[in-house]
Amino acid sequence: MRKLSRRQNENLKKIKNVVHSSLEEAITLLQDTATAKFIESVELHANLNIDTKYADQQLRTTVTLPHGIGKSMRIAVLTNEANFNEANEGGADIVGSQELIDDISQGNLNFDLLVATPDMMPKLAKLGRVLGPKGLMPSPKSGTVSTNLTETLSDFKKGKFEYKADKTGVVHVNFGKANFSKDQLMENLTSLYQSIEQNRPSGVKGKYFKSLFICTSMGPSIQLDLNTFD
């Protein structure tokens, strides 16, 4: 077994395996355990009572957090030439048509998000093997297939992003950086929790949340009481 570092041992002593009902106390502890030599991301890990092999128990949606997540997103837009100006003026970092498809097919994925107009989707079908594993395939559900590029780009530039439950029914998602203010992290986390709650799959029976943990990129997990947001 790998020996824990001094920093890790000190952080484990801080959390004391307590389940926190106070969001403010949990966020304070979260920031106190952000002791790495870089600015750590902060994460929510929500274990949900869902079985994602059933269509009515899948969770995949988008959210815009009040204070973003501290990351600038590089956005590519795949559309026809008639929409190039709108995409460029909307703040797209890459705009293209067939030439962008060719780049993607060669594995050039120098973007964090791909937005496409509906007319380009048939041409993207053959690139599912390239884009799918990276989570970059545009879809109407994620808001990345759109005819209104101006609005779509504005939303994503403001921090809108997609999240989903994995095969085990757990949502792993960043909600900011450890150097955000306590209030910013509390507001972001509350908004994220509310988004998960509001998008509860129709097939869920009984309680929805099984457990909630927050942590920094390199820090220990801090458990939240399931009634923290009530």
Swiss-Prot record:
Gene3D superfamilies: 3.30.190.20, 3.40.50.790. GO terms for cellular component: chloroplast; large ribosomal subunit. HAMAP family: Ribosomal_uL1_B. Part of the 50S ribosomal subunit. The gene is rpl1. It comes from Thalassiosira pseudonana. This is Large ribosomal subunit protein uL1c. Its main location: plastid. NCBIfam families: rplA_bact.
